[in-house]
């Protein structure tokens, strides 16, 4: 059992690790933060910043249950944030480093509007805060041993900052890789676009459905002092594919091209179907 610290702030006792809660004031808000007292098995090597493609995430959500619907971001053809994941090389996790430090919506209130736009809970019918709560409890509480992440506000703010700096929408578009329901792309071209822009090896994840590779997520990695670095060595469902002499970290089937789908809402599809039916009726 970790050491007990009797302090004016808060008494905390955790297995294998001890923390002290303190507070800091920023922009008029009282933010809870975490000060590390000891280190433990929850240590990690890298931070993985994961961006997801909303159209594919929506497709996967609907696949689980045909009654599911999606809450898409305002810009449906823009990459959104999934999370920032502390990771130990060759292992999964750490995760859930402090189950007593629950997600508190008040801590991210100043940036909530921004989060709703780019760190979107696509799963309609679930709580607005369910994704943020999950990411904070599972990953944020582990990242919090670093000063740059030792509060909810800092953790989620860093996600916003990294998205602005490393937007996959901008990186891919600058290489003429854009969402399309008719054109597909080679995985090596997607990897090359990211690698040439950032100078590091990303992880590219696909979801396979109906015999097609759908791009799902792109992950980039950072050292604990927040310097971008290669993702080599992370343990995910990743295959080190060698394509034309290039090593690519991906689970995408290299024998086929990748679909980067443009999102088409169900309501728009129904409207189009009705319009086409009406036009056919006019020509009778």
Show where each model-derived region lies:
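Cleaved targeting-peptide boundary
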Residues: 21-32
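Cleavable N-terminal signal peptides of Sec/SRP-targeted secreted and luminal proteins
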Residues: 3-22
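Betabetaalpha-Me/HNH-type nuclease active-site subdomain
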Residues: 32-125, 197
């Amino acid at each position: 059992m970790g050491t007990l610290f009797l302090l004016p702030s808060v008494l905390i006792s955790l297995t294998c690790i001890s923390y002290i809660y303190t507070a800091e004031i920023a922009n008029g808000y009282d933010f809870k933060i975490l000060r590390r007292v000891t280190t433990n098995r929850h240590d990690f090597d890298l931070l993985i910043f994961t961006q997801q493609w909303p159209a594919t995430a929506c497709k996967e959500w609907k696949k689980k249950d045909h009654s599911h619907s999606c809450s898409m971001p305002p810009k449906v053809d823009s990459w959104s944030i999934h999370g920032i994941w502390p990771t130990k090389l060759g292992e999964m996790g750490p995760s859930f480093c402090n189950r007593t430090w629950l997600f508190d919506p008040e801590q991210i209130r100043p940036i909530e509007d921004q989060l709703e736009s780019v760190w979107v809970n696509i799963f309609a019918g679930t709580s607005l805060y369910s994704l943020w709560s999950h990411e904070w409890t599972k990953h944020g509480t582990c990242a919090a041993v670093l000063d740059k992440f030792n509060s909810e506000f800092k953790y989620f703010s860093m996600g916003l900052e990294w998205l602005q700096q490393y937007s996959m929408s901008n990186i891919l578009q600058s290489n003429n890789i854009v969402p399309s329901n008719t054109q597909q792309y080679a995985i090596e071209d997607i990897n090359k676009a990211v690698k040439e822009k950032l100078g590091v090896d990303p992880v590219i994840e696909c979801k396979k459905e109906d015999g097609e590779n759908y791009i799902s997520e792109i992950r980039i990695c950072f050292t604990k002092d927040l310097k971008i670095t290669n993702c080599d060595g992370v343990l995910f469902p990743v295959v080190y594919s060698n394509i034309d002499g290039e090593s690519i970290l991906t689970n995408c089937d290299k024998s086929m091209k990748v679909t980067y789908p443009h999102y088409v809402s169900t309501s728009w599809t129904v409207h189009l179907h009705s319009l086409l039916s009406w036009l056919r009726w006019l020509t009778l």
